[in-house]
Amino acid sequence: MTRSITICVLTLLSSLVFPTASFTALPENPSRPRVRTYYIAADDVMWNYAPVGRNLTGTPGPENESGVSSTIYRKAVYHEYTDGNFTSLKPRTAEWEHLGILGPLIRAEVGDIIKVFFKNNTKFFCSMHPHGLAYAKESEGALYTDNASPEAKKGDAVPPGQTYTYTWTVPERAGPASGDSSSILWVYHSHFVEPRDMNTGLLGPILISAKGSTKPDGTPKDVEREFIVAFAVFDETESWYFESNAMNRKKYTQGLRFSDPAFRQRYLLYSLNGLIEGNLPAMTMKKGERVRWYLFANSNDDDVHTPHWHGQTVVFNNMRTDMVHLEPMMMVQADMEPDNVGTWLFHCHVNDHIEGGMQALFTVYP
């Protein structure tokens, strides 16, 4: 499998040249679309799926059977930087700490232009590919045979250490439809070798609001609190760093062959935003606040989920419910007005996923 992927990738790359992309800023002009600029890099990290080292939900069942060392993996994640020098990380505010492994939040309104200055700090080729937005071939960020010119393919596979600039636009069809909430979720991710890229950790959220519907800080006017949660099964056997991670985990797979289902099971992490067993940072809100939840699933075979909130209900697709359904890479939003004070469980209702630790807590204050 690895050999066939390598041959395919080398064939597609053979005709490409990868100079550093450049961008000339548009002058200030009220008649022009608003340009939202982001500086994002793909960085290597050591990621801990359970940094506290234990199950914080208190639900009955065994703690992670392999111990905390089995939840530490080398991964790649998207980080936001303050400028194009890519030397100073932009701090993540407390309200967005729950994003966990997800890349920085990209926001825009219908009619805007999004400019992403991207740098690849990893050891493998990668990219940034957005769902839902409009883009030319130069900014698709997805490597496949599409008869585009070599010049138009440069952003599909950014080499280690190199930079590239993506330009995405937000037409009406990228924003909320009639009957939608005022803001909707899209996802961006690396699309070089998509299964490997995403299982390595390269994915993040995009929120698009209807034109004129946001506050000065970019949040929707009709919402007081937002949460973004990825119901993500990470298959570490599909990571670019599987070999190096496996070297540190041999004792957990002794006597198992790679082809054994039990071997792969040891490398499946059932996470919410890359964190398991209640290790997701606190999600808090006040009674009566207007809360919007944005949910999506990762792209593995196991990523069929039924997110469920205890103690509250939400409005999803104009229906009152306390549980929604997700398929691989499906994105949804649900609105909540919490009325039940306390700390509540939020989890996937698929039994294997509950047992794997796909659970978190949220708290409603008076």
Please report, for each region that a protein language model flagged, where it lies by residue.
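Bacterial N-terminal signal peptides that target proteins for export
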Residues: 1-9
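Copper-binding active sites and cupredoxin-like electron-transfer domains
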Residues: 21-366
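Bacterial N-terminal signal peptides
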Residues: 8-19
